[in-house]
Design a protein with these regions (language model features):
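Active-site/ligand-binding loops adjacent to catalytic centers
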Residues: 38, 103-181, 220-244, 252-256
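Glycine-rich beta-alpha junction loops
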Residues: 58-61, 90-93, 115-120, 129, ...
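Active-site/ligand-binding-proximal alpha/beta "capping" segment
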Residues: 48-92, 97-101, 149-152, 156, ...
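Glycine-rich acetyl-CoA-binding "A-motif" of GNAT/NAT acetyltransferases
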Residues: 285-288, 326, 347-350
Length: 366
């Protein structure tokens, strides 16, 4: 199965658990590039004896499934009275299939496109033309080309929805209605709400919860990930604490104690996919232990994993008060070190080069 690399790890792990071989391709290239997921999949099928390329973007069975099942189900459940249907477009099968059926059975029904900001499809609906493709984090909808199955000419109105609006709407859907849905659902619901608010009389409007939010727990429903993407933010403090990605007072920093064993520290490193931990005693940082410290002290002797962290940690810790100038932080990072940020002696968190770059990027995005 060929999958763009921006897809959530839950989707990828799920597919592998089912026995699929998952091949990741670049999501930063457009159609026609050899690393684009559709071009890669077609080439792989051509080169593999006995392979079958399903190609949902050009397979007539795709819209047919929606014309024969989704459309009549919606029509029956709403007793034949649907004013508008809000859809997203990935392969185009949902929109194309629904339009084909409703054109015959309910021609009054309008089709509304919910499109991620950065996709070209809303431009095509509005003007019949499109320019450069942008980028977006929402998964499963939005395109950098016009899917032939989509029948965009039948779309009444298109709404562009930013990642920020989509993710916040999906999170609100969970908080208010108890529905745990995926990222594209946030895009569709945002567009549906905008459409409804623009009407002058009540209408019966349909949209979809396209996927379970279980596939997005590491991304859209993870506050740390949302902050790293600049989609939610803490109040600015105007000091070095603004650069901390994982704050200790929020329980986000993984730490060690001086009397922890090296085995326990190594287990934490693997569990949280990190390479270094601050060592705390009475709320103060007394050292840092990283993978190289473990290598130097274990030296292939598994019995040495029982050594305490205090024997392996580096005691040379670069600590900055949160009120220090940014130039002092940069000087520490220039030496390839990680900076410990404190409020007087109280540990707040670590700052790495990546944390600084993320903070700077998010400032520009705002």
């Amino acid at each position: 199965l060929v999958v763009p690399d921006k897809m959530s790890r839950e989707k990828i792990f799920h597919l592998r658990a089912l026995g699929a071989t998952v091949l990741l391709t670049r999501s930063d290239v457009n159609k026609g590039h050899p690393a684009y997921y559709q071009d890669y999949a077609r080439r792989l099928a051509d080169e593999t004896p006995g392979a079958f390329y399903i190609d949902q973007f050009n397979n007539d069975a795709n819209p047919l499934a929606h014309a024969t099942s989704t459309a009549p189900e919606l029509y029956q459940q709403l007793e034949g009275d649907i004013d508008a249907i809000v859809v997203g477009v990935g392969s185009g099968g949902t929109l194309g299939g629904l339009q084909a059926w409703f054109a015959e059975h309910s021609p009054k029904t309008e089709f509304i496109l919910a499109d991620p900001a950065g996709s070209i499809l809303a431009d095509q609906v509005d003007t019949g033309r499109y320019g450069e493709t942008g980028s977006w984090l929402v998964e499963g909808i939005g395109e950098d080309f016009i899917p032939p199955l989509a029948r965009l000419e039948g779309v009444h109105t298109a709404y562009r929805v930013s990642d920020r609006e989509a993710f916040h709407t999906a999170r609100q859907l969970l908080q208010v209605e108890g529905v745990l849905a995926g990222s594209s659902t946030g895009t569709l619901l945002s567009a549906a709400l905008r459409y409804c608010r623009a009407q002058s009389r009540p209408k019966r409007v349909v949209t979809f919860a396209c996927d379970s939010g279980n596939k997005y727990l590491s991304k859209m429903f993870n506050d740390d990930w949302m902050r790293q993407q600049g989609l939610i933010a803490r109040p600015e403090q105007g000091d070095l604490s603004d650069f901390i990605a994982l704050r200790h007072d929020e329980g986000a920093t993984v730490t060690a104690a001086p009397d922890d064993t090296l085995a326990a520290v190594f287990t934490r490193m693997r569990l949280y996919d990190i390479s270094q931990l601050p060592v705390l005693e009475d709320g103060r940082v007394v050292g840092i232990v990283d993978e190289w410290d473990l290598i130097r002290h274990v030296q292939g002797d598994r019995q040495r994993f029982s050594l305490p962290v205090s024997e392996a940690m580096s005691r040379h810790v670069e600590t900055l008060d949160k009120r220090a100038p940014e130039s002092e932080l940069q000087a520490i990072l220039d030496r390839g070190l990680v900076a410990v940020i404190a409020d007087n002696t109280r540990f707040l968190g670590l700052v790495t080069r990546s944390d600084v770059l993320t903070a700077w990027r998010n400032r520009v995005a705002q």
